[in-house]
Amino acid sequence: MLQSPAQRYQADLDSGAIVPDEAQRITVDALQDLYLRLEDRAQVKPGLLDRFLNRSRSAPEQGLYLWGGVGRGKTYLMDAFFEALSFDKKKRMHFNRFMQRVHEELTELSGMKNPLDAVADRIASETIVLCFDEFYVSDIGDAMLLGGLMQALFDRGITLVATSNIPP
């Protein structure tokens, strides 16, 4: 049976697998809240008119950016959140791998008008929740590309959860 992020965290505390940490508790509370909102939305099925008018995607639930030092439990907490989600349209990947995929798709779509929209459409067809481990952008070109892509994903109702060692 699936455990919510809060249940998983508490079970791991009770078993001694992890030690209590106030920052983790605060993060678990935020992940639990997001988890509950996403699960509620997953239960609502769009009607025929909504599908006809392409209104099946509403505004995304605001995601989370988990940052802190190495070894603080960010990836563990994000994974607990990801594993708890009961629906299949979710994706978890290392951020570097995601950027490789984006660059590959942009190369494939070169010459197309608005290729970022096509990439966003592909991603949105696969997932409604996108979890990135080790989110980090150092290249100005990637930063500019990500600005447009993230907006396109949010416009398509995608919720983002990311871990990083770098403050926002």
Give the location of each predicted region.
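Short glycine-rich substrate-engagement loop in P-loop NTPases that contacts/grips substrate
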Residues: 90-127
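Phosphate-binding P-loop
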Residues: 37, 43-44, 53-61
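Conserved lysine of the Walker
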Residues: 74
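Hydrophobic anchor at the beta1->P-loop junction of P-loop NTPases
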Residues: 66
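Walker A (P-loop) phosphate-binding loop of P-loop NTPases
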Residues: 71
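Post-Walker A helix-loop "phosphate-sensing" segment adjacent to the P-loop in P-loop NTPases
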Residues: 82-91
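Hydrophobic positions on the alpha1 helix immediately C-terminal to the Walker A/P-loop
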Residues: 77, 81, 94
